[in-house]
Protein backbone atom coordinates (compact mmCIF):
# COMPACT_ATOMS: atom_id res chain seq x y z
CA UNK A 1 0.00 0.00 0.00
CA UNK A 2 1.54 3.34 -0.90
CA UNK A 3 2.25 6.06 1.63
CA UNK A 4 -0.26 8.63 0.36
CA UNK A 5 -3.12 6.10 0.40
CA UNK A 6 -2.19 5.18 3.96
CA UNK A 7 -2.34 8.83 5.10
CA UNK A 8 -5.69 9.35 3.36
CA UNK A 9 -7.13 6.21 4.95
CA UNK A 10 -6.05 7.25 8.44
CA UNK A 11 -7.64 10.68 8.12
CA UNK A 12 -10.81 9.74 6.28
CA UNK A 13 -11.64 7.13 8.91
CA UNK A 14 -12.32 9.83 11.48
CA UNK A 15 -9.59 8.29 13.58
CA UNK A 16 -6.78 10.68 14.42
CA UNK A 17 -4.40 7.82 13.62
CA UNK A 18 -0.67 8.28 13.55
CA UNK A 19 -0.95 12.04 13.11
CA UNK A 20 -3.45 12.54 15.91
CA UNK A 21 -3.06 14.32 19.18
CA UNK A 22 -5.42 13.30 21.95
CA UNK A 23 -7.96 15.93 22.97
CA UNK A 24 -6.32 16.54 26.33
CA UNK A 25 -2.97 17.27 24.65
CA UNK A 26 -4.10 19.34 21.67
CA UNK A 27 -2.17 22.47 20.89
CA UNK A 28 -2.47 24.72 17.90
CA UNK A 29 1.29 24.60 17.39
CA UNK A 30 1.49 20.81 17.26
CA UNK A 31 -1.62 20.55 15.09
CA UNK A 32 -0.21 23.12 12.66
CA UNK A 33 3.10 21.26 12.47
CA UNK A 34 1.27 17.96 11.92
CA UNK A 35 -0.73 19.49 9.05
CA UNK A 36 2.50 20.79 7.50
CA UNK A 37 4.05 17.34 7.89
CA UNK A 38 1.07 15.73 6.12
CA UNK A 39 1.43 18.21 3.26
CA UNK A 40 5.16 17.51 3.02
CA UNK A 41 4.44 13.75 2.91
CA UNK A 42 1.94 14.18 0.08
CA UNK A 43 4.44 16.23 -1.89
CA UNK A 44 7.33 13.82 -1.22
CA UNK A 45 5.34 10.79 -2.27
CA UNK A 46 3.99 12.34 -5.47
CA UNK A 47 6.90 14.42 -6.73
CA UNK A 48 9.74 14.16 -4.24
CA UNK A 49 13.30 13.06 -4.75
CA UNK A 50 14.50 9.65 -3.62
CA UNK A 51 15.89 11.23 -0.44
CA UNK A 52 12.57 12.98 0.30
CA UNK A 53 10.68 9.71 -0.15
CA UNK A 54 13.13 7.94 2.17
CA UNK A 55 12.65 10.64 4.80
CA UNK A 56 8.86 10.37 4.44
CA UNK A 57 9.08 6.59 4.92
CA UNK A 58 11.12 7.04 8.12
CA UNK A 59 8.64 9.65 9.37
CA UNK A 60 5.78 7.23 8.69
CA UNK A 61 7.51 4.50 10.72
CA UNK A 62 8.16 6.95 13.57
CA UNK A 63 4.54 8.09 13.56
CA UNK A 64 3.32 4.49 13.52
CA UNK A 65 5.47 3.80 16.57
CA UNK A 66 4.11 6.96 18.20
CA UNK A 67 0.54 5.78 17.64
CA UNK A 68 1.33 2.61 19.63
CA UNK A 69 2.68 4.58 22.59
CA UNK A 70 0.50 7.71 22.48
CA UNK A 71 -1.24 8.32 25.80
CA UNK A 72 0.91 5.87 27.77
CA UNK A 73 1.40 7.42 31.19
CA UNK A 74 4.81 8.56 32.36
CA UNK A 75 6.41 6.42 35.07
CA UNK A 76 10.01 7.09 36.11
CA UNK A 77 11.87 3.84 35.46
CA UNK A 78 8.91 2.44 33.49
CA UNK A 79 9.50 0.44 30.33
CA UNK A 80 6.10 -0.83 29.20
CA UNK A 81 2.69 0.32 27.99
CA UNK A 82 1.60 0.45 31.63
CA UNK A 83 4.07 3.29 32.14
CA UNK A 84 7.26 4.51 30.50
CA UNK A 85 9.91 7.15 30.98
CA UNK A 86 11.70 9.21 28.33
CA UNK A 87 14.81 7.09 27.81
CA UNK A 88 12.80 3.85 27.69
CA UNK A 89 10.46 5.38 25.10
CA UNK A 90 13.43 6.49 22.99
CA UNK A 91 14.89 2.99 23.26
CA UNK A 92 11.58 1.32 22.33
CA UNK A 93 10.94 3.61 19.35
CA UNK A 94 14.47 2.93 18.06
CA UNK A 95 13.94 -0.80 18.39
CA UNK A 96 10.60 -0.64 16.53
CA UNK A 97 11.64 1.76 13.76
CA UNK A 98 15.34 1.08 13.17
CA UNK A 99 15.75 -2.40 14.69
CA UNK A 100 18.56 -0.92 16.76
CA UNK A 101 19.17 -1.37 20.48
CA UNK A 102 20.03 1.71 22.48
CA UNK A 103 21.21 1.84 26.08
CA UNK A 104 18.43 2.14 28.66
CA UNK A 105 19.41 5.51 30.17
CA UNK A 106 19.77 8.95 28.57
CA UNK A 107 23.31 9.46 29.91
CA UNK A 108 24.38 6.48 27.78
CA UNK A 109 22.11 7.25 24.80
CA UNK A 110 23.81 10.62 24.36
CA UNK A 111 27.08 8.78 23.64
CA UNK A 112 25.65 6.73 20.75
CA UNK A 113 26.21 9.01 17.79
CA UNK A 114 27.22 12.40 16.46
CA UNK A 115 25.85 15.62 17.94
CA UNK A 116 23.81 17.87 15.65
CA UNK A 117 22.25 21.30 16.09
CA UNK A 118 18.51 21.99 16.00
CA UNK A 119 18.74 23.34 12.45
CA UNK A 120 20.43 20.13 11.25
CA UNK A 121 18.03 17.62 12.83
CA UNK A 122 16.73 14.75 10.70
CA UNK A 123 13.92 12.30 11.26
CA UNK A 124 15.04 9.70 13.79
CA UNK A 125 17.63 11.82 15.55
CA UNK A 126 17.52 11.66 19.33
CA UNK A 127 16.93 15.05 20.93
CA UNK A 128 18.22 15.97 24.38
CA UNK A 129 16.99 18.60 26.80
CA UNK A 130 18.33 20.15 29.97
CA UNK A 131 15.33 21.17 32.10
CA UNK A 132 17.40 20.95 35.30
CA UNK A 133 21.08 21.08 36.09
CA UNK A 134 22.03 18.32 33.64
CA UNK A 135 21.01 17.02 30.23
CA UNK A 136 18.60 14.29 31.26
CA UNK A 137 15.50 14.37 29.04
CA UNK A 138 15.48 12.55 25.72
CA UNK A 139 12.99 12.13 22.88
CA UNK A 140 12.89 11.09 19.20
CA UNK A 141 12.71 13.72 16.46
CA UNK A 142 10.08 13.04 13.78
CA UNK A 143 10.42 16.08 11.53
CA UNK A 144 9.04 19.60 11.07
CA UNK A 145 10.02 20.46 14.70
CA UNK A 146 7.94 17.55 16.07
CA UNK A 147 9.25 14.92 18.46
CA UNK A 148 7.86 11.88 20.29
CA UNK A 149 7.97 12.80 23.94
CA UNK A 150 7.33 11.01 27.25
CA UNK A 151 6.07 14.00 29.21
CA UNK A 152 6.09 13.63 32.98
CA UNK A 153 2.77 15.50 33.17
CA UNK A 154 0.95 14.28 30.02
CA UNK A 155 2.40 10.87 29.19
CA UNK A 156 3.48 10.07 25.64
CA UNK A 157 2.60 13.00 23.38
CA UNK A 158 3.81 14.73 20.26
CA UNK A 159 5.65 17.95 21.12
CA UNK A 160 7.31 20.72 19.11
CA UNK A 161 10.73 22.32 19.37
CA UNK A 162 8.95 25.57 18.51
CA UNK A 163 7.13 25.64 21.84
CA UNK A 164 8.71 28.14 24.24
CA UNK A 165 9.33 25.48 26.91
CA UNK A 166 11.13 22.98 24.68
CA UNK A 167 12.99 25.68 22.77
CA UNK A 168 14.33 27.00 26.08
CA UNK A 169 15.64 23.61 27.26
CA UNK A 170 16.82 22.04 23.98
CA UNK A 171 20.52 21.11 24.12
CA UNK A 172 21.32 19.17 20.92
CA UNK A 173 20.40 16.21 18.78
CA UNK A 174 22.35 13.00 18.34
CA UNK A 175 22.38 11.17 15.01
CA UNK A 176 22.66 7.42 15.53
CA UNK A 177 21.60 6.22 12.07
CA UNK A 178 22.09 7.16 8.44
CA UNK A 179 18.77 8.15 6.89
Residues of each region from the PLM?
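Aromatic- and glycine-rich peptidoglycan recognition patches
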Residues: 1-16, 142-179
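Solvent-exposed, polar/charged alpha-helical surfaces in well-ordered, non-transmembrane soluble domains
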Residues: 60, 64-68, 88-96, 122, ...
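Structural motif
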Residues: 124-125, 145
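Catalytic cysteine-centered active-site loop
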Residues: 72-123
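Intrinsically disordered, low-complexity
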Residues: 1-72, 176-179
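A conserved glycine-rich beta-strand in the N-terminal activation segment of trypsin-fold
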Residues: 138-139
Amino acid sequence: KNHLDYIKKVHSSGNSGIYGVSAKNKSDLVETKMAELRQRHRKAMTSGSTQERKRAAVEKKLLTSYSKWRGTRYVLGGDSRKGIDCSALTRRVYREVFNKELPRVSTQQVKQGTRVSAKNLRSGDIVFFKPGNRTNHTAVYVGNTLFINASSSKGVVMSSLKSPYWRKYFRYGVRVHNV
